[in-house]
Amino acid sequence: MNETPNTRMAELFNAMVDAYETWAEPLSARLAQVALRRTTVSAGDCVLDIGAGTGALSLQAAALGASVIAIDLSSAMVARLNQRLAPYPECKALVMDGQALTFEDCTFDAAFCVLSTTLFPKWSAGLDEAVRVVRPGGWLGIVPWANPEGADIFTILSRALKKLPLPTGSPDAPKLTALMSAHELRAALEARGCEVTEVDRLDAPSQLPPPECFIYR
């Protein structure tokens, strides 16, 4: 099987479901909470969560009474999220590429990309698709990283990796440079016909494990 950026990304996240849910989801959940509160999403709305992971935004939207469809490239993430969405019969998670959504135009009242858009090989395609599937007057919440290596801990890890004798050809940590600045994000959304209501920088705490269990599989 030929390896593509999508399959590499899926394999990466398939291998870290437990660690992601424990250590990464609390940060994503805080950002998702802020994004949801800045919209009018409520019971009965149809919400799309793009790059949903283990459900940081999906679970909060479901608790509001929204009908949520969550998508992710990682089949393991999707399986975990479907387990967690079981109490919400109107909600489900699907394996799908956010750069090529299979939904009709104007399907959703709101769509969210929390820390996922900049992971796409073609973030512009992902943004195009998110805009396409939201109805006129609906909500689109985009939460990119505000620095090129993501959370502060990733900066520390990146520096540490550079000091290790890694095998030839080992990939570098991805640079999450797309949509970092408020100006760039606003311009990208306005170019796609969106009325931008707010663009803010948010600092949120990131929970870290103790050193003895920091890296595990």
What are these model-derived regions, one by one?
Residues M1-D45, A56-Q60, M77-R84, S158, ...:
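Conserved class I S-adenosyl-L-methionine
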Residues S124-W139:
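A short glycine-rich, Lys/Arg-flanked "PGG" loop and its adjoining helix->strand segment in the class I
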Residues M9, M16, T197-R217:
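C-terminal helical/coil "lid" or tail adjacent to the Rossmann-like core of SAM-dependent
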Residues W139-P209:
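Conserved catalytic/acceptor-binding region of the Class I
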Residues A110-S124, A146:
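A short SAM/SAH-binding and catalytic strip from SAM-dependent methyltransferases
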Residues Q99-A111:
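A short acidic, Gly/Pro-enriched loop at the edge of an enzyme's catalytic core
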Residues C46-L101:
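Class I SAM-dependent methyltransferase SAM/SAH-binding core
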